[in-house]
Amino acid sequence: MLAIFTTVFIDMLGFGILIPVYPLLISEGSPFRVTPEGWSFTQGLIMLGWLQGIFPLFIFLAAPILGQMSDRYGRRPVLAVSIFGTAVGYAIFAVGISTANIPLLFIGRALDGITGGNQAVAQAAIGDVSTNENRAKNFGVIGAAFGLGFILGPYIGGRLSGPDKSFYGLFNTPDWFSATTPFWFAAILSLCNCALILCFFPETLK
């Protein structure tokens, strides 16, 4: 359950983690602005709308395909490959910010959306191992992971993108934190989750 919980959590983390980074990508004077100098703020907002929308769009398109693949090849390999793809998507997005490359941003979000379709696989795996007695509880845990990822995504994105900011008076964030830090963090988290799937998650498809 831990591996499945983490998978769903990271998928939804990817939806919210971008929200606090948005202004940095289009604001005048921001060191992480990716839009050309000639673009208006409205044009930047339109670009951000497409950038946010491409993620759920590709989840919608990919979820049935990944679900069918998991029925044929098994839950474990499809989960592992898709989670690794999520890590790559985060890394591509971080590079896109660093290089102010808008196409890379869209590629990263699209790949993250495609691999984020593994929620269907995660739910299928839960169905495989659940009994009539614990089915509702197990799917409730997955729902909690869904909500937690969506809630913490914006918070993590905001915290990790701010250099030298006080953390409730306890310490300051490192001065090398930037708009790319949340995505490198999510990429590393995804790789750890991939290792968790490969090492500890048994195949559930009978």
Question: Could you tell me what each predicted segment is?
Answer:
Residues 1-56:
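Helix-loop boundary and gating motifs at the non-cytosolic
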Residues 9, 89, 102-117:
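Hydrophobic core of transmembrane alpha-helices in multi-pass small-molecule transporters
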Residues 48-67, 148:
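Central cavity-lining transmembrane alpha-helices of secondary-active solute carriers
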Residues 84-99:
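C-terminal ends and interior cores of transmembrane alpha-helices
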Residues 108-146:
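Cytoplasmic helix-loop-helix junction between adjacent transmembrane helices
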Residues 142-199:
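Helix-loop-helix hairpin linking two adjacent transmembrane segments in secondary transporters
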